[in-house]
Curated annotation (Swiss-Prot):
It catalyses: ATP + H2O + 4 H(+)(in) = ADP + phosphate + 5 H(+)(out). Belongs to the ATPase alpha/beta chains family. Keywords: ATP synthesis, ATP-binding, Cell inner membrane, Cell membrane, CF(1), Hydrogen ion transport, Ion transport, Membrane, Nucleotide-binding, Translocase, Transport. This is ATP synthase subunit beta. InterPro entries: AAA+_ATPase (IPR003593), ATP-synt_VA_C (IPR055190), ATP_synth_F1_bsu (IPR005722), ATPase_a/bsu_AS (IPR020003), ATPase_alpha/beta_chains (IPR050053), ATPase_F1/V1/A1_a/bsu_N (IPR004100), ATPase_F1/V1/A1_a/bsu_N_sf (IPR036121), ATPase_F1/V1/A1_a/bsu_nucl-bd (IPR000194). F-type ATPases have 2 components, CF(1) - the catalytic core - and CF(0) - the membrane proton channel. CF(1) has five subunits: alpha(3), beta(3), gamma(1), delta(1), epsilon(1). CF(0) has three main subunits: a(1), b(2) and c(9-12). The alpha and beta chains form an alternating ring which encloses part of the gamma chain. CF(1) is attached to CF(0) by a central stalk formed by the gamma and epsilon chains, while a peripheral stalk is formed by the delta and b chains. NCBIfam families: atpD. One of its GO terms (cellular component) is proton-transporting ATP synthase complex. It is a peripheral membrane protein. SUPFAM superfamilies: C-terminal domain of alpha and beta subunits of F1 ATP synthase, N-terminal domain of alpha and beta subunits of F1 ATP synthase, P-loop containing nucleoside triphosphate hydrolases. The keyword Ubl conjugation does not apply. Gene3D superfamilies: 2.40.10.170, Bovine Mitochondrial F1-atpase, Atp Synthase Beta Chain, Chain D, domain 3, P-loop containing nucleotide triphosphate hydrolases. Produces ATP from ADP in the presence of a proton gradient across the membrane. The catalytic sites are hosted primarily by the beta subunits. The gene is atpD.
Amino acid sequence: MSQGKIVQIIGAVIDVEFPRDSIPRVYDALKVESTGLTLEVQQQLGDGVVRCIAMGSSDGLKRGLPVTNTGAAISVPVGTATLGRIMDVLGTPIDELGPVATEERMPIHRAAPKFDELSASSELLETGIKVIDLLCPFAKGGKVGLFGGAGVGKTVNMMELIRNIAIEHSGFSVFTGVGERTREGNDFYHEMKESNVLDKVALVYGQMNEPPGNRLRVALTGLTMAEKFRDEGRDVLLFVDNIYRYTLAGTEVSALLGRMPSAVGYQPTLAEEMGKFQERVASTKTGSITSIQAVYVPADDLTDPSPATTFAHLDATVVLSRDIASLGIYPAVDPLDSTSRQLDPLVVGDEHYSVARGVQMTLQKYKELRDIIAILGMDELSADDKLTVARARKIQRFLSQPFFVAEVFTGSPGKFVSLKDTIKGFKAILSGEYDHLPEQAFYMVGGIEEAVEKAASL
């Protein structure tokens, strides 16, 4: 355990000088003795100086303070003892319930699984959310991105997915809060407690008030815990909210580390950092990690380098649209922009595939006719087009659904709709079975039977 001393402090980036014969390796964890602060080595600058990122606030540090090299990477507690606990980037519990009861720890930097260990799956994961199950189905062991700008419902969608999957599938989950609001983390904890699924979820938080070092590494902390469950042969869910903040934390420290910025001011290593993280989120022959990641889209621009880099790694993309949210349709999923590799007749079957494509064709036709309607009015449309518009508006409303986690806002009880009922409902609307019902009957209901009941009371 070699000793060094601080020689320079620039915000979250700290230079430490060690004797030449005992320079720490890259990714080694160093400890500032007087404050207990952990530093992670990023670069060796020569002359015994290493450049580090602080895993906490650098307030109160000064030059000359002694620093000890731990000789290993940051390691965090893993295993079932982490379930029901809230931890920070170093795996230290922050829920005031005492230490995590496990001796087992794993380093947060690990190699991705080897190619011959990987396993692909086409088994579907039913979420109970109609628009997702129908148009962008999730694969067990796949990676899903929830894309959306500010305030279109990424976190609410994610909370609903966790609630549905944790209750209906009774698997283990790891929730990683990367640079999001502390209030949401608090709400989420109480939501899980009330739903009685807290004992199946490990929570790792590095919120937006934390220094960039915490936000940069907290995603890896959560991932390491999920990898342990996978290696024990379990099927685990990894939720990351928000993967954009992981990129952003890298951007914040990149310039301080002396790197030239690339497009839009992002770090030049953007693709590499994202790839390192995403390649570890993989399913092996032992167990699976199904990952659902919220992706903030800056200024609603999907071509921004950060969301654009994330796209390449995903099996399904759920795009949340401000236009749909403004119509009052929640979840505000864009049915024409959201995609999934699983939407293939060989995976989902012919009936599901044809209904999903029929829904998209009807909505696309309605989108094309909207300009004509805006200029000339509905009366100028042909009888066929009028029918298409009427069905499209019913479909649009039937894609909305009351959420369990939003009951406090909407006042209506949440609904879990099975895939079978979802396909049955949309198939009936497309075939014209419900042409006689008013479109309001389809808004914020679960299955199609509920829409029929609602129509009777209108």
